[in-house]
Amino acid sequence: GETTSWSDPIVTDLRDLSKVRFDPQNEYFQGILNLTETALRHAEGEFIVGYTDLHPGVDCAAALRGSTNLCMDFYDDPEGIPPLLDAAVRDFEWIFNRFHELLKEHGQPSVSWMHVPSFETMHIPSADFSSLISSDLFNEYCLPIHLRETALATHNVYHVDGPDVARHLDSILEMNSVNPIQLVHGEDYGNRSRQGRNLRRHRQDAGTSVIVDLHKDDLAEFMKVMDPRGLFLWIATESEEEEHEIIRSLEQWARSSSS
């Protein structure tokens, strides 16, 4: 798709990671920095600029190795995976701080694509690749990396990309460094599904704040089964009139729930 990123794997042998190194002068990193700086120069007093989407850890490792190859590595060479994961998170602190400092120099909050700003530091951890592995493998290989990356930010909103990632939620929520979670439905997991509503309700009952990407046609049914406390809804609309109508519905929902 046009709104995602693609990569060509470069690691053909887990025992040779010589190609895995970060060059701050590479054209892609410099290009993103230049775009960010240009936006910041035009943003003063007008709008907020976020830093680019960052994917350290297992998703970076999957890009370097290839998802299929990495899946097979868990069977064929599990001892070779930790060095690759370490290489995939090694430079994250420097990169994260570089963007954070750039935003602060221009008086901007710390914010990225999720539009959740922080006056301190904000990060969106994720592990989309974890949809392909078991919870045991997630706990062994992914959690330690998550703990390293989330320790850098004051606020961490975990991006749960679909039901196959959501099966790791209990482990994700054990991390004290993760604040709310953002639940995304898959193509076969729509907001209309009972499974999706039950999952959100289960997380809310556990006291976890939840960001929900919700279709406007699902709002009425959603409000019947959910408590509004701790929710942040993303709802796309077609017009300003529709937006006001949705706001009125949400206000009524909040009043009825608090009474």
PLM region spans:
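A contiguous, low-structure linker/loop signature
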Residues: 1-16
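Active-site loop segments of alpha/beta catalytic cores
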Residues: 1-3, 22-259
